[in-house]
From Swiss-Prot:
Transmembrane segments: none
Species of provenance: Mus musculus (Mouse)
SMART domains: PDZ
Protein origin, superkingdom: Eukaryota
Pfam families named among the record's database cross-references: PDZ
Coiled coil, from the record: none
Primary gene name: Pdzd9
Protein name from the UniProt record: PDZ domain-containing protein 9
PDZ domain segment(s): 27-109
Amino acid sequence: MEKGSLKSKNEKEQLSKAKASVSSLNKVIQTKLTVGNLGLGLVVIQNGPYLQISHLINKGAAASDGILQPGDVLISVGHANVLGYTLREFLKLLQNITIGTVLQIKAYRGFLEIPQEWQDVYDLIPETKFPIPHTPKKTEPARESLVKDDHEEAVLDKKLKYYRYPRSVWNHPVRTPISISTEWHGYEKKERTISVGRDINSDVVIHKDDKKELRAPSPYWAMVEQDRAISSSSSSTANSSSSDAFWLEDYAQVEEGNGKQVSKFG
């Protein structure tokens, strides 16, 4: 137990001596940074027992502030003294800080140089090329031009004035088109006269006359009907009705043949 306590005391003494020597020999840089979407905008490496800034993220908080530079050794971030911190401990510290928090940063300058291997891999660090999310504000002239474009793209047909093809998937939702069969055929019937006749050029061609489609009844059916209707008729009347029935049957057959010929030409 005594050996362990002695070692810890010796380490603390060495660290305090190092702090004293560093503070006396190097310049202390102090600034305030606001945590943004890219954090503090720093690429930090572990150089021995210290956390050193190797690069600044383009358009990050540190790059926009312009005070911290690559090569600075971090002393404190906020109220936490980060001298002797590992990268894992430093990451845990930053994870508990929310966006928008203003932190006071202290660092030593000119104390340690960045290792050469880190200077050569600047283009390989993806954090230095983060895209900066931004939402451009639309000015009034831009809005007026968009309104004019919308009016120019409106459909001239009054029947389809509520339908417009989508210009962009992101800006204009697709609208359901109006039923073409309902709209187009609806007003066409009101404006056009339909011709009906036997001529081929007519819209509706009649192949048979309605009067000729009435077939004569069967002679047997006519005889039965006559028997039921007139039970007390004379023999001469029955003979005339039966002869009329046969004559109607012959007339129906002739008309049926004429109808077939007309349908061929139609």
